[in-house]
């Protein structure tokens, strides 16, 4: 075989080192451009990450294959790179040696190649393209198998656009058919072959799809004809892991050949006689098949090169048309069909729907997989319908038919009459295929957006209803409970509420249920469940002393042990709070933002409140995991929302500590029956306990910062090393830090 093949085969083990991302890219590219080997592609893939840019560069001719005949000067860096680089072929490409030798020399062993070739993941398309690639031909008897026509042999320079090259080259087509010695020149033609292979190959498949049964018996008589069919069939029957480009090519059915590659002149003659026999039978179905061909080509082009615009495609298809005409002068029988095909292709190129964005690729691929004949496609995006269509009788297609699928869809999707009208107007000017496809995409997109909108609306509706019902419940509770409970101390409430109190206690014992208002962790506000005091509210809500709003940190309420003063205090302020936010934090936990709405993540609570061992609760000393080392006091009396008359903290810290203890004792000793006067006047306005606490807390925080700064400054003056700033670790101000 050719040196190129030997090189790549020799190194086949090294392809295992290729990382999977690169490998999948190379797979895809080898399918789109059959005559580029993976070796050719490796360097491009390594140089450009994005598949689309690579495809653009290859199709526009900015990048050409490395080959022995003509080395374009600009691309020398590629050659150097490629010579140094150990060649890494595709393990699972069909083995070109197998395909080509059996094709040319002995046609009878039609099954061997596919058994040898290690590819599970390629469809028939892969095999055919392999056979068609001119890469490895050396001897004269190897015939280039590109659908019976010769791929132009002119090397592609960087300057000529490949469209120009194609049109020039069609002159050579007919004479070159049988003698095929010019191997090297063939090597040089990069782009034209790859584009045309893709399309011709597509056409062949489509034609074969049409006539499975007619030719079943002929396979036995003519192994030469059937060799390619069997190849495709066996490869198709293995289970496959496919790259997306492979998926995009329509699934092969059992295959018949109408226009086979010109393998040699004798077979060509045999073939022509066959065609004469079949002609009357297959006339109608072949017209249909031709139309399908064009559509399938369009689809493949669109999936393969979603980023290309129309300008790119026009030259490609035109070049193909010229070639087809040149070639089919030999196969006189098919001329009429070709004419139709060409018209349709021109139309397709002109059609505005042609440019398909990457977003729509998904839609397309699914359409291609189940590939219904286009004329029966009820292009409603429901897979069952698509899968039924191939069994329906197939009629030759008339351009008027696309209006039928529309009428079928209209009852199903009455929501979109306007869109469909627009579509109909557009579509009367468009060719069959582009039309059906565009419609399919648009419909399926509409379908999805509709569904999303409906779901969204339903969710909103449910949420609103929940919210309303909660508001009502809450209002009822407020009406029933407040009077009786303001007279009861909390401890005498019904056994049920005590049970709830115990549950709350149990839950809040554990750290992660954010029982400390200061506790936070990074994801905390991402879920609705974790707004600040939320746990308390949910569980204590039914003890209608809805504690949460009264006293922000409501350390105690869950425990069922706080005295009557809290109960009364809570009720007075809870009524006000209820007026303000009718659905408590239960319905919308986010409302409850503990620090007066401005949530200061660290300063406001990190230093003072974050850790459990800082805050033994009075009533509950036994339940709390940690105790303070000095006799049990905590630094700010937030419990009942009284304002602590903060001592002047600038004075000596010890006096401050002792004063605090005294104020605590006073608070504890107040008789339980009589609620303390809650509302104080500030600026002539009543201050609710929440605000008091915020003022107090903020004041303490300021003190603490000032103190820390002062201590640090003093330490700096005295030359004490940095960390030792003379804190008294027992004093209240330094405790939250360490």
Swiss-Prot record:
Could you tell me where this protein is found in the cell? Cytoplasm; Nucleus; Chromosome, Telomere
Q: Which UniProt keywords apply?
A: Chromosome, Cytoplasm, DNA damage, DNA repair, DNA-binding, Nucleus, Phosphoprotein, Telomere, Ubl conjugation, Ubl conjugation pathway
- Compositionally biased spans, kind Basic and acidic residues: 69-84, 211-220, 256-291
For the modification Phosphoserine, the affected residues are 260, 273, 307, 646
Source organism, top-level taxon: Eukaryota
Summarize the PTM comment: Ubiquitinated. Proteolytically cleaved by the proteasome in response to transcription stress; the resulting N-terminal form constitutes the activated nuclear form and the C-terminal portion is degraded.
Task: Give every CUE domain span.
Answer: 21-63
User: What are the boundaries of the signal sequence?
Assistant: none
Q: Which GO terms describe its cellular component?
A: chromosome, telomeric region; cytoplasm; nucleus
Q: Which residues carry this modification: Phosphothreonine?
A: 338
- Compositionally biased, Acidic residues: which spans? 298-328, 337-358
Note down the stretches annotated as region Contains the proteolytic activation cleavage site: 500-530
Say what the protein does. Recruits the ubiquitination machinery to RNA polymerase II for polyubiquitination, removal and degradation, when the transcription-coupled repair (TCR) factor RAD26 fails to efficiently displace stalled RNA polymerase II. Also involved in telomere length regulation. Binds DNA.
Assembly description: Homodimer; may form higher order oligomers. Interacts with the large RNA polymerase II subunit RPO21; the interaction is direct and serves to bridge RPO21 to the Elongin complex in a manner dependent on transcription stress. Interacts with RAD26.
Q: Give the family this protein belongs to, as stated in its UniProt record.
A: Belongs to the DEF1 family.
Q: What is this protein called?
A: RNA polymerase II degradation factor 1
Taxonomic lineage of the native organism: Eukaryota, Fungi, Dikarya, Ascomycota, Saccharomycotina
């Amino acid at each position: 075989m050719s040196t190129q093949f030997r090189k790549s085969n020799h190194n086949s083990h090294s392809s295992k080192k290729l990382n999977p991302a690169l490998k999948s890219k190379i797979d895809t590219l080898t399918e789109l451009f059959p005559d580029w080997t993976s070796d050719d592609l490796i360097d491009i893939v390594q140089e450009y990450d994005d598949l689309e840019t690579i495809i653009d560069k290859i199709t526009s001719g900015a990048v050409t294959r490395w080959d022995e005949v003509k080395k374009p000067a600009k691309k020398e860096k590629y050659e150097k790179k490629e010579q140094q680089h150990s060649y890494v072929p595709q393990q699972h490409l069909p083995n070109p040696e197998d395909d080509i030798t059996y094709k040319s020399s002995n046609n009878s062993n039609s099954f061997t190649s596919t058994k040898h070739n290690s590819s599970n993941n390629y469809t028939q398309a892969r095999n055919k393209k392999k056979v068609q690639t001119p890469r490895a031909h050396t001897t004269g008897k190897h015939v280039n198998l590109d659908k019976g026509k010769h791929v132009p042999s002119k090397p592609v320079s960087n300057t000529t656009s490949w469209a120009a090259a194609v049109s020039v080259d069609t002159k050579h087509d007919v004479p070159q058919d049988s003698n095929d010695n010019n191997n090297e020149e063939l090597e040089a033609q990069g782009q034209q072959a790859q584009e045309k292979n893709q399309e011709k190959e597509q056409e062949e498949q489509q034609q074969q799809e049409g006539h499975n049964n007619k030719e079943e018996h002929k396979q036995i008589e003519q192994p030469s004809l059937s060799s390619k069919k069997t190849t495709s069939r066996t490869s198709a029957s293995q289970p496959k892991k496919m790259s997306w480009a492979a998926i995009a090519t329509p699934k092969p059915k059992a295959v018949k050949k109408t226009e086979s590659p010109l393998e040699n002149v004798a077979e060509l003659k045999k073939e022509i006689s066959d065609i004469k026999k079949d002609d009357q039978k297959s006339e109608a179905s072949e017209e249909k098949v031709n139309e399908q061909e064009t559509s399938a080509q369009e689809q493949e082009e669109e999936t393969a090169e979603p980023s290309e615009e129309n300008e790119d495609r026009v030259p490609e298809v035109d070049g193909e048309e010229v070639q087809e005409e040149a070639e089919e002068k030999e196969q006189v029988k098919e001329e009429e069909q070709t004419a139709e095909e060409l018209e349709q292709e021109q139309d397709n190129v002109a059609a505005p729907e042609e440019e398909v964005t990457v977003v729509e690729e998904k839609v397309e691929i699914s359409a291609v997989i189940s590939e219904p004949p286009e004329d029966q496609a009820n292009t409603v995006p429901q897979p069952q319908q698509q899968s039924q269509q191939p069994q329906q009788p197939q009629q030759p297609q008339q351009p008027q038919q696309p209006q039928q699928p529309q009428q079928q869809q209209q009852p199903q999707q009455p929501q979109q009459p306007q869109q469909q009208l627009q579509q109909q107007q557009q579509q009367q000017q468009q060719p069959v295929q582009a039309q059906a496809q565009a419609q399919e995409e648009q419909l399926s997109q509409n379908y999805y957006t509709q569904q999303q909108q409906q779901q969204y609306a339903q969710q909103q509706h449910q949420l609103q209803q929940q919210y309303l019902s909660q508001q009502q419940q809450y209002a009822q509770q407020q009406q029933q409970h407040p009077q009786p409970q303001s007279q009861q101390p909390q401890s005498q409430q019904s056994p049920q509420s005590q049970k709830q109190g115990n549950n709350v206690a149990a839950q809040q014992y554990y750290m992660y249920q954010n029982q400390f208002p200061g506790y936070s962790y990074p994801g905390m506000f991402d879920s609705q469940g974790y707004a600040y005091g939320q746990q308390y509210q949910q569980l204590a809500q039914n003890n209608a002393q809805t504690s949460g709003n009264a006293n922000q940190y409501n350390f105690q309420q869950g425990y069922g042990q706080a005295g009557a003063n809290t109960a009364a205090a809570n009720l007075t302020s809870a009524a006000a709070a209820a007026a303000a936010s009718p659905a408590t934090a239960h319905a919308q936990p986010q409302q409850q933002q503990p620090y007066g709405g401005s949530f200061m993540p660290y300063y406001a609570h990190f230093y003072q409140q974050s850790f459990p061992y800082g805050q033994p609760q009075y009533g509950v000393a036994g339940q709390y995991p940690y105790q303070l080392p000095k006799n049990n006091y905590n630094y700010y009396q937030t419990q009942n929302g009284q304002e602590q008359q903060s001592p002047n903290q600038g004075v000596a810290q010890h006096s401050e500590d002792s004063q605090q203890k005294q104020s605590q004792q006073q608070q504890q000793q107040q008789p339980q029956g009589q609620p303390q006067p809650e509302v104080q006047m500030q600026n002539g306005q009543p201050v609710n306990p929440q605000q008091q606490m915020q003022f107090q807390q903020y004041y303490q925080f300021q003190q603490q910062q000032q103190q820390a700064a002062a201590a640090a400054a003093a330490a700096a003056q005295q030359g004490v090393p940095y960390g030792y700033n003379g804190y008294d670790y027992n004093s209240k101000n330094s405790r939250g830090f360490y």
